[in-house]
């Protein structure tokens, strides 16, 4: 922005910014608010939001969650596929979008990659895209079947869809509850080795290199995992 690191006045008319300048002369009908050390930015985007509705409304309703997002500066959010029912069809995706209409923050649903997020049968991705989904993934569940990931990446290229793959190898992670190391041994808790993440990421990136497409890997927690993604980006792979 040309206004970066500068002090400016901002004129807002009917909810929209109409002018930015160092000194704006306000007429008598204009309400003036003065703030010290106030920072202004473009609206933010959250790529992984969980609301309670539908299915867990006692935690938080969708309208309340979107209002909180708007008041926090988020103009767009990506809704995780952990509702009940799981959003694995066009009708459920459409229902989520319909519920969010008229609110300040725009909601983009993540559709489940597999039916009921069970990891077996690929869901109707094209139907969900036409219903308003923009990405597909089984919330916090890795894609254990390598061929399923390959097919999903290939199929999504026909409509610019993105696949989300949670970076954990369940067999290596086992029933671990924390990082495997001296501390986990000392306090007697089952640990998860770092390679449970890096092995899964390496596999997913090899499949992406073969299949093409767009892949998003969330919740990276290891240096090795970050290094693998950096190298893949340098090779031109569409991974985030």
Where are these regions (language model features)?
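Active-site metal-binding motif and surrounding structural segment of the metallo-beta-lactamase
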Residues: 24-40
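N-terminal metal-binding scaffold of metallo-dependent hydrolase/deaminase domains
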Residues: 1-27
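Active-site loop-to-helix "anion-binding N-cap" substructures in soluble metabolic enzymes
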Residues: 54, 81-104, 111-134, 144-145, ...
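Alpha-helix-loop-beta-strand connector modules within alpha/beta enzyme cores
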Residues: 41, 90-110, 154-168
């Amino acid at each position: 922005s040309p206004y970066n690191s500068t002090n400016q006045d901002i004129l807002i008319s009917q909810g929209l910014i109409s002018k930015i300048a160092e000194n704006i002369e306000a007429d008598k009908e204009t309400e003036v608010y003065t703030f010290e050390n106030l920072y202004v930015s473009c609206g933010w985007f959250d790529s992984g939001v969980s609301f309670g509705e539908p299915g867990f409304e006692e935690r938080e309703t969708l309208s309340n969650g979107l209002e909180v997002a708007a008041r926090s500066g988020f103009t767009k959010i990506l809704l995780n596929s952990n509702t009940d029912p799981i959003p694995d069809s066009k009708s459920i995706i459409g229902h989520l979008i319909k519920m969010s209409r008229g609110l300040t923050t725009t909601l983009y649903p993540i559709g489940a990659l597999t039916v009921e997020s069970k990891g077996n049968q690929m869901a109707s991705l094209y139907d969900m895209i036409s219903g308003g989904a923009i990405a597909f993934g089984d919330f916090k569940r890795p894609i254990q079947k390598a061929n399923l990931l390959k097919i999903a990446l290939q199929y999504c290229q026909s409509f610019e869809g993105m696949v989300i793959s949670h970076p954990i190898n369940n067999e290596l992670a086992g029933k671990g509850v924390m990082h495997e190391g001296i501390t986990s041994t000392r306090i007697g808790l089952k640990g998860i080795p770092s390679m449970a993440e890096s092995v899964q990421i390496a596999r997913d990136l090899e499949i992406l290199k073969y299949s093409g497409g767009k892949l998003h890997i969330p919740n990276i927690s290891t240096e090795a995992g970050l290094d693998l993604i950096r190298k893949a980006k340098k090779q031109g792979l569409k991974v985030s």
